[in-house]
Amino acid sequence: MSESVYKVIELVGTSSDSWEKAAANAVEQAGKSLRDLRVAEVIKLDMQLDAKGKVEAFRAKLSVSFKFEGT
């Protein structure tokens, strides 16, 4: 097995429906511009509220790794 290096970035996904969809949105969007995604780990879950305290959006902060192809 050859040696590999992975880069780790943080992303925040949002959804008006759920934290699960917020996390999935972040990974799906990252997959459009990053190749070889490997692992996504949920770091933090929170909600965006309006002035009356009603939930406007669910937010998921993720740590995502992908294979580094630097020289």
Task: Label the predicted regions.
Residues 52-71:
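C-terminal structural segments of small proteins and small subunits
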Residues 4-38:
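Short, well-ordered alpha-helical segments
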